């Protein structure tokens, strides 16, 4: 009888472990793999930023805001110059992967200064960009786009007259 119980217990244990092993069978699934390769972007300046000729008052600070459409708005102690001057947006050509969107990075406020030969300076703030493709800068089906940059020139009360010049950086990258 003891042998029968031992044999019965062994059979029962083998059956239990067999059922347990079946409950833990391996499962397999698959995942997609891929990559998107993009062309390096290029940026080429085609025009410089120029606020044109400005008449400066003596007692008031002023601003000259150059829109991305190429028009100036004057406030405070400055008005449009009476001597001919050219108003231009900074303009750029961009190339890259066709139909890809990108972002334009412009200077932060109070980081760009223009200076005249006597050492007097002015700040340029509120840089804005507008792509030819609209609010979201996007390369065409040929992988090209253009954009213009506007900004605001801050003119101090009694600002020294002269020709002011400076530089600023613009960069582009894929979204």
Residue ranges and their predicted role:
Residues 10-11, 21:
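Cleavable N-terminal signal peptides
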Residues 22, 128-130, 138:
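Serine/threonine-rich, low-complexity intrinsically disordered segments
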Residues 24-106, 139-175:
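N-terminal small/polar-rich segments of proteins
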Residues 17-24:
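Sec/Tat signal peptide C-region and signal peptidase I cleavage site
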Residues 94-133:
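Contiguous segments within soluble domain cores/interaction surfaces
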Residues 7, 19, 170-171:
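Short, low-complexity polar/charged micro-motifs in intrinsically disordered terminal tails
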Residues 1-9:
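Bacterial N-terminal signal peptides that target proteins for export
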């Amino acid at each position: 009888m003891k042998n029968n119980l031992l044999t019965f217990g062994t059979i029962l244990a083998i059956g239990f472990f067999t059922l347990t092993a079946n409950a833990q069978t391996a499962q397999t699934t698959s995942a997609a793999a891929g990559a998107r390769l993009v062309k390096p972007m290029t940026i080429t300046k085609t025009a410089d930023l120029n606020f044109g000729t400005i008449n400066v008052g003596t007692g008031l600070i002023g601003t000259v805001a150059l829109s991305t459409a190429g028009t100036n708005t004057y406030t405070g102690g400055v008005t449009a110059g009476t001597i001919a001057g050219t108003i231009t947006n900074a303009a750029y050509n961009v190339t890259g992967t066709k139909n890809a969107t990108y972002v334009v990075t412009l200077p932060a406020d109070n980081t760009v200064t223009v200076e005249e030969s006597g050492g007097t300076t002015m700040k340029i703030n509120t840089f804005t960009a507008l792509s030819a493709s609209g609010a979201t800068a996007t390369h065409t089906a040929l992988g090209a786009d253009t954009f213009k940059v506007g900004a605001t020139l801050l003119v101090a009360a009694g600002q020294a007259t002269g020709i002011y010049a400076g530089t600023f950086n613009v960069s582009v990258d894929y979204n």
